[in-house]
Amino acid sequence: MNQCYFLSSFLSPQQPESPPLYSFQEINDLLALNFTDKDWQSYVILRRFFDLENFAFFWAGKSIPFSFGTITNSNVESLLRLQMWSDEWEFEDFFKDFLLRYKTPQERLTHFSELVRDFLDHYQDYPSEFLRTYFRFKQDLRIILAGFRARVMQKDVSFVLRDEDSSNPIVLHVLMQKDSPNYELPDEFFELRDVLGDYGRLPHMLNQTLSFYEFHKVEEMSRDKYLNTDAILSRLTTYLMAIRSSWASVQKGKELINLMEKGIRW
């Protein structure tokens, strides 16, 4: 409780449009001193989720652009070869099954969404209430966006969601929209209606707006939590989002400069 009180009072709220309040190293150093082993484990799982897409970069034959320390350019091959996150922590059974089912990098890349789905589902039994809530939100949001994308691209939504759990109310809701003239969202996602309507066909704007939406939803998840690990994990999630957003903004700037330089040379 003393550590939670200290961290809750020390860690300032992050604003979605602002630069990161703390560097990734500063966060790690602070938590290493104040988190219990159990709390640290929850933080590691959160970072793994943020880093999960780095496997997709690797299977696509691309360099991993950014990491929160769990899946990096230097360790990704050994992680997959040994099927272990660390000396003490093996890959989860769903991950081992995924690697057994899909042998080639192209197969794994094609079916990467299955890995994300299974990761989010697996941790629905995890002790941390925040991680359960956040991962369920991410799972449901993933399904809603897949349904919206299918509609925009005029694809059969039942085919797009063929591998999803048909008992999930969100999956059922999206499937019921198949022949509807409008894409009606579940009540818990009603705030997305205007976002998808205004920015749904502009990928860059949609990505930015969705980030703001997710940021505020994460804040809501800890609104009634005080002086406990779940409240801290919620705030840490906003920090990780801000750090990743800051990095992405820098990369976009570099890409723009590179394009300008190529234009001058041409």
From Swiss-Prot:
Pfam families: DUF2764 (PF10962). InterPro entries: DUF2764. Belongs to the chlamydial CPn_0087/CT_309/TC_0583 family. This is Uncharacterized protein CT_309. It comes from Chlamydia trachomatis serovar D (strain ATCC VR-885 / DSM 19411 / UW-3/Cx).
